[in-house]
Amino acid sequence: MKTLSAGLLALASAASAHYTFPSLIANGVVTGEWEYVRQTENHYSNAPVTDVSSEAIRCYENPGRPAAKTLSVAAGSTVGFTVSPSIYHPGPLQFYMARVPDGQTADSWDGSGQVWFKIFEQGPQIDPSGLTWPSDGLSQVQVTIPSSLPSGDYLLRVEQIGLHSASSVNGAQFYLSCAQLTVTGGGNGNPGPLVSFPGAYSPTDPGLLINIYWPIPTSYELPGPPVWRG
């Protein structure tokens, strides 16, 4: 019984150190869990993705998940995700978007292909004492939809990468979700560069294979393409 109890405590401790992004925030309103966000495979375990070559790195969708709804938001507005329970591991925060192809819908499109562009990245503050990550401890994260983004249906992908064990290959931990949006009032921008998931990252990218503790890094290279500023 003691062994079983210890095992359950260990599992509970591991789950509490991990996290999900279950709810979309729009117009200051927190929507229901997995209402506009595709339910992720870790919705019970909170466990991360560690293989950047797997299909899970795209949206980490739970097989047989309930269909999510699509929320209408204005270009130039701020949207976000809740974090359950909160961001625990040190690492960067990034947001990507992908436009749903003509003839398809946000609730059924799988997001495959070279279609993703980055709209936000947040790295560390660096000083001689170490790296400080602005996303540490957050229970909500937000991003502005570029005002020149063309109107249409999109997937919005949030990603926070835990680098506490990233000194070995595949040690980086990816926590992510995809929400379904219809962007209105957009412009005539041309988002890019475009990447695919999987494909955007290599397990040996400098921002994914790194000891963030010692020797203290003097720089940090965020993984993925440059941000499209709109």
UniProtKB/Swiss-Prot annotation:
Cystine residue pairs: 59-178
A Pfam family annotated for this UniProt entry: AA9
CDD domains, A to Z: LPMO_AA9
Amino-acid positions noted as binding Cu(2+) in the UniProt annotation, renumbered to this chain: 18, 89, 175
Subcellular locations according to the entry: Secreted
Induction: Expression is up-regulated during growth on wheat bran compared to that on glucose. Expression is also highly up-regulated on beechwood xylan as the sole carbon source.
InterPro entries: AA9, AA9_LPMO
GO biological process, one term: cellulose catabolic process
Keywords attached to this entry: Carbohydrate metabolism, Cellulose degradation, Copper, Disulfide bond, Metal-binding, Monooxygenase, Oxidoreductase, Polysaccharide degradation, Secreted, Signal
Cofactor: Cu(2+)
Enzymatic reactions: [(1->4)-beta-D-glucosyl]n+m + reduced acceptor + O2 = 4-dehydro-beta-D-glucosyl-[(1->4)-beta-D-glucosyl]n-1 + [(1->4)-beta-D-glucosyl]m + acceptor + H2O
Domain of life of the organism encoding this protein: Eukaryota
Span of the signal peptide: 1-17
Biotech use, per record: Lignocellulose is the most abundant polymeric composite on Earth and is a recalcitrant but promising renewable substrate for industrial biotechnology applications. Together with cellobiose dehydrogenases (CDHs) an enzymatic system capable of oxidative cellulose cleavage is formed, which increases the efficiency of cellulases and put LPMOs at focus of biofuel research.
Binding-site positions, O2: 164, 173
GO molecular function: metal ion binding; monooxygenase activity
Its EC number(s): 1.14.99.56
GO cellular component entries: extracellular region
Cofactor note: Binds 1 copper ion per subunit.
Functional summary from the UniProt entry: Lytic polysaccharide monooxygenase (LPMO) that depolymerizes crystalline and amorphous polysaccharides via the oxidation of scissile alpha- or beta-(1-4)-glycosidic bonds, yielding primarly C1 oxidation products. Catalysis by LPMOs requires the reduction of the active-site copper from Cu(II) to Cu(I) by a reducing agent and H(2)O(2) or O(2) as a cosubstrate. Active on hemicelluloses, including xylan, glucomannan, and xyloglucan. Preferentially cleaves residual xylan in phosphoric acid-swollen cellulose (PASC).
UniProt family annotation: Belongs to the polysaccharide monooxygenase AA9 family.
Protein name: AA9 family lytic polysaccharide monooxygenase H
